[in-house]
């Protein structure tokens, strides 16, 4: 049971970090600066140091709750660091960062998805609906004068 918690909490933290970044979208990636991610990782490391330093004083459920919070926050910040590095460097760093992420959170990393949501597609393909909308760009505006298409007689 203890090993299950050790594997489940970092995965849950990484899931929460990924959900947070995906929920915010591209604007959230712009807001999530390197300074904020590094500050949160410094906070987690300092919390780890304080927990280790004062862990002999804590007994029972307090020690377990702080330990669970620490493991969850390490997974969360690790996921935010992964997202920030991928945002800054691009998808080229994934083969290098894959083993590091696996060792950091102790689980399997989720596959990166492309712009259209396909997991293994490396090339972005345009949607036929988007192409149709782009082709209709020469149509008149809603309130403007209409012109006839075809051959004028």
From Swiss-Prot:
Residues 132-153 are annotated as: Disordered. It is found in: Mitochondrion membrane. InterPro entries: Mt_uS3-like (IPR052694). The chain crosses the membrane at residues 7-27, 31-51, 64-84. GO terms for cellular component: mitochondrial membrane. It is a multi-pass membrane protein. Keywords: Membrane, Mitochondrion, Transmembrane, Transmembrane helix. A stretch of 270 kb of the mitochondrial genome is duplicated within the centromere of chromosome 2 resulting in the duplication of the gene. The expression of this duplicated gene (At2g07674) is demonstrated. This is Uncharacterized mitochondrial protein AtMg01020. The lineage of its organism: Eukaryota, Viridiplantae, Streptophyta, Embryophyta, Tracheophyta.
